[in-house]
Amino acid sequence: MRRRVALSTAIALLVGAQLCVAAEVEVAGAGGGVVRRRSLHQPFFPIEWSPPPPMSGSEAVPPPPPAAAASATTGGGRSTTTVMNTVAIALSAGLVALAVASYSCCLLLRRRRREEEDDGDRAAKRAVGAAAAVAARVPSDVGSSSRQHRSPPPSSTASDAIYLDPLTTLVEVRQHEKSPDLRPLPLLKQPSPDLRPLPPLKRPESQPPPPPPSTPPLTTTGYSTDEEDQATYYTAPKTAMSSFSRSTSQHSTLEQTAMPPMAAPAPPQTNPPRPVRPPPPPPPPRQRLLRPLPAESPPPAALANLELTGSPVKPAVEDRGGENSGAARPPKPPHLKPLHWDKLRAISGRTTVWDQVKNSDTFRVDEEAMESLFLNSGGGGAGSSDPAARRGGSGKQERRLLDPKRLQNVAIMLKSLNVAADEVIGALVRGNPEDLGSEFYETLAKMAPTKEEELKLKGYSGDLSKIDPAERFLKDVLGVPFAFERVDAMLYRANFDNEVNYLRKSFGTLEAACEELRSSKLFLKLLDAVLKTGNRMNDGTNRGEARAFKLDTLLKLADIKSTDGRTTLLHFVVKEIIRSEGFDSDQSAVNPGSGSKEQFKRDGLKLLAGLSSELSNVKRAATLEMDTLSGNILRLEADLEKVKLVLQLKETCSDQGASENFFQAMVVFLRRAEAEIKNMKTAEENALRLVKETTEYFHGDATKEEPHPLRIFVVVDEFLLILDRVCRDVGRTPERVMMGSGKSFRVPAGTSLPPHRNENRRVLSSSDEDSSSS
């Protein structure tokens, strides 16, 4: 519609513009007398017009006449006609434009009126439909209208709500669209009517029987029609579909209200019952059915009342008590200590000894004696209600100064010592560690109390018989000045000699191991045999022609297998050493007998087996740890401060005369301990120096690569274990005769490998990982 109006206006303006242009042209033609009047469809210039020929230079162009002269030549009547024509043209153009605009406005108003009529019809249809829906819901919602709606006044009927005037409906709908009653109401979560709490009920004796179940009457607010008064409905609580309604008439409106929450049930009253009865309650839950119920069940309402007041359980208990009142319950026997045994199941169809025991009546148990002897104090017998009786009949109650767990540990350690407090006090006063021994002082040091426990024990001035024996022991020991400081000093003194002897022996073992390893001729011959064998195997490679090797190579000899896999390189070296030791290189090449061979073999094996006993200190040194030895010296030096602390406390001791022997013994021991610690440090330095020299003697400059200084002894110890096993294998293997050209011959002692060995000939190969050379 708007496009049509705009198009009409544009056409009117275009027509007006053309008329104005035509008027201007007409005026110009009338003023000059040259331009003729033309029609609207004619162009501005004629088609046959051609430009005039050019003028010659001799011809003079006359100047144009002045405007006054031109105007004077035209007559007065012609100017008047031109003005009138202009006015007429302008008036015609204005009328045309006005007509077009008026037509456009008429079209717009007509379109608007049609839209309003269509909107009114649709609104009337919606109102009629809403009224019909309300009229259809009236019978189902009238039962709950007392809580949610207001009934229409008596003058309004269902017909008024259905058949409505469209104009009236349109006006009312527009008025009610802004009403707050038509806004969506929030949905309230309300329980089902079957799960609503029941009102309080009364006791069965005062509660009359309930009436038969009936539908509750209809309750409304406001007015209702005669047809609604005659009907009775029961409506469930408000739902999402019934909670939203609209009013369609001024005479019949339903007000939407939410159901208020129900209050808690009031306590039971003795007032007469109200005429209106609630519906019967739902059946009792499973837990309620498990409870004891009376013999005759009351009505549902009375049952709910009895459940709330708790009265039905009491009569049931009283009735049962009356039934069992004649038979008294026997007293529960006291609990005795358990006997843990394995019970056997009865075997049918077989006679056992237990059948005879079961049928025998020769033995009867004295229950009173058993209860007096084997009563379980923790079980709590039937007659032992007194706490003192449950603890064994003693009414004396002990007082605890220490934590129960801590006290239990002290009691266990004190029981293991099995000494009295007087003996401990005497040993601490005299200062002689040999009286009780180092183990006693070590256990006593673990019993040392904390500062807080010490204050509690010293501050207790009550009856000593009311505290625990372990607490009494600690309290007696704490009577000695700085008692547990003395215990630490005595423990250090008792263990000092053992620690010093262990260190002295360990350092001596290291020195002896170094001497044995450097002076052993058999070990030197073994190294020579391994070096020559390795050079023969590595001949022609970059690992050949070695002059030395690390002792770690000895551990790899047993890993190199022969071609047939029956022997190893270490077995071969052992056999060669036995052969070289059994034959003399200066003897003639006479083939010895078989008896001499066996004797040579036994002598050689005996010689090699003696290498382990020859290097016994090396095996002991392999079990030592240099870090442990150094740590023991540092610990001895640090613990010596405990002795110095006890001597410093001498000035604070109140009874110095009684402890004079202790302090004198500690002073003498302190001087000796300082001297011994100094000697141990010197022995440690000497041992480390010898170990370093021995390692350099075998490894040269590779000593810096060793992870710890005593590794050389560990390597030799492992090799000796492997060598002993190989010697046992060789001793069990029969002697193999070396054959050459059908005869056996003797290899000189200076030769490492024989030129020919048909039976034991092998092709040995090794890799960089299996052997190393220097």
From Swiss-Prot:
Residue spans of biased composition, Pro residues class: 51-67, 194-216, 262-286
Record-annotated disulphide pairs: none
A Pfam family matched in the record: FH2
GO cellular component terms listed in the entry, alphabetical order: cytoskeleton; membrane
Domain FH2 as annotated: residue spans: 326-749
Compositional bias ranges of the Low complexity kind: 68-78, 242-261
Disordered: annotated span: 51-78, 130-163, 176-338, 374-402, 740-774
Keyword terms of this UniProt record: Membrane, Signal, Transmembrane, Transmembrane helix
InterPro entries reported for this sequence: FH2_Formin, FH2_Formin_sf, Formin-like_plant
GO MF assignments: actin filament binding
Claim: Iron-sulfur is one of the keywords in the record: no
Signal peptide positions on this chain: 1-22
Topological type in the membrane: Single-pass membrane protein
Subcellular compartments: Membrane
Any one biological process term the GO annotation gives: actin cytoskeleton organization
Residues spanning the membrane: 89-109
Family: Belongs to the formin-like family. Class-I subfamily.
The protein's name in its UniProt record: Formin-like protein 13
Protein encoded by which gene: FH13
